[in-house]
Amino acid sequence: MANMRRDDVIWTLAITLIAVTINPVLKSIGLLPADVFRNLGVAFPGQPQIVFGPMMAFLLVMLFLKTGKAMVFPVIGTLRALSLSFVFPANIEHSGTLLAAIVAGGAAVMVLNNPQWAQSRTWLSLLAGLYAGLYTVCNYLSTLAFGTAAQTAIILGSPLRTIGIIVGSFLLGTVLGLLGCSLMRPLQASVFAPSAVRYGV
């Protein structure tokens, strides 16, 4: 992520700050999704990821479009995972967010290496959906691997609800990715601009 422009650095710092502070801020004011779902009587393991997965996908795809750097996914994903491990040390399943960010970073590299994909809002939106879906899937995988027996029993006992949360995360991430593409069009890096625009053809 070297040789970034000043405005790219500012964007990166701002989104990194949001990624690492949003959970503790929401926790401090009583609006953490897990608490909200619990108060509404609809709590379910992993359900908050249908909020955080698409939200992070939206932010990271916008930053990806702004900087043209695939590393924004694993770098900010790592920082977010570290932040969550300090705020919620008992919830080791948050390590799944790191795995999702690494895989999404690899997908972002593939997008950059294929000009047709990089210039397609559809592929960029699907990248956001992929990250949001992976965010939820990896959370569930890490919960099954490291979580409590009670959590595992609830998740495996309600497969349709679990799948619904995963699919919902993917769909919301895709929609927010499309919105991010529209919002970032005036600011996007040249690699994402159609050839006719970039070369004045």
Predicted regions: what they are:
Residues 27-32, 36, 79-110:
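Interfacial aromatic-anchored transmembrane helix boundaries in multi-pass membrane proteins
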Residues 62-75, 114-121:
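Membrane-helix interface "capping/anchor" motifs
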Residues 16-25, 77-89, 129-140:
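Aromatic-anchored segments of alpha-helical transmembrane domains
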Residues 9-14, 54, 70-78, 95, ...:
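Hydrophobic alpha-helical transmembrane segments
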Residues 15-23, 106, 173-181:
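Hydrophobic core segments of alpha-helical transmembrane domains in multi-pass membrane transport
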Residues 28-32, 37-45, 119-201:
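Membrane-embedded alpha-helical hairpins and interfacial helices in multi-pass inner-membrane proteins
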Residues 2-71, 105-113, 181, 185:
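Hydrophobic transmembrane alpha-helices
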